[in-house]
């Protein structure tokens, strides 16, 4: 998320609120919280929005154990969520052999969906934004995807909600 200084936090929350309304005002939102800038910004926006819209907000941090900083990331996320009064679960996953990036992504999405089911969450909020969308479309194009693949990610796909998708 390339932070645009012209967009203040209230405007960001308004964008997330518009997306929230567009996807039907889900009552239970589970945030995929990596601890990176994008997901932390979305966490703060959702905490602010929760005061206006009165939904249940929780978070899940998927711990792949692939980086030396993985434990510190999990501790950071837990401390931040405690400070913001957001329930958080850290889920440890095993990444199989093969394409490490693809295996990690598959393990992450399995963990997200399992946690969403366990919490009866209506949506899983992801912090994908316009830069991620461009990257996705380019990767699909390079792999020879047709028109469907070049469409990119949707704001709501199944129970995956991307409220920042239109933001640079």
Regions found by a protein language model. Give the residues of each.
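Core alpha/beta nucleotide-donor-binding catalytic domains of modification enzymes
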Residues: 3-168
């Amino acid at each position: 998320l390339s932070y645009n200084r012209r967009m203040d936090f209230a405007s960001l929350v308004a964008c997330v609120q518009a997306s929230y309304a567009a996807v039907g005002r889900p009552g239970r939102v589970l945030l995929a919280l990596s601890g990176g800038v994008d997901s932390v910004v979305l966490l703060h926006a959702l905490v602010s929005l929760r005061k206006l819209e009165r939904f249940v907000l929780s978070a899940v941090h998927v711990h792949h154990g692939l980086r030396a900083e993985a434990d510190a990331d999990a501790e950071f996320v837990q401390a931040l969520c405690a400070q913001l009064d957001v329930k958080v679960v850290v889920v440890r996953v095993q990444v199989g052999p093969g394409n490490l990036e693809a295996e990690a992504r598959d393990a992450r999405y399995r963990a997200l969906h399992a946690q969403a089911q366990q919490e009866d969450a209506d949506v899983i909020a992801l912090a994908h934004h316009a830069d991620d969308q461009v990257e996705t479309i380019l990767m699909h194009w390079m792999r020879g995807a047709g028109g469907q693949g070049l469409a990119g990610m949707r704001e709501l796909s199944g129970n995956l909600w991307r409220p920042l998708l239109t933001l640079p």
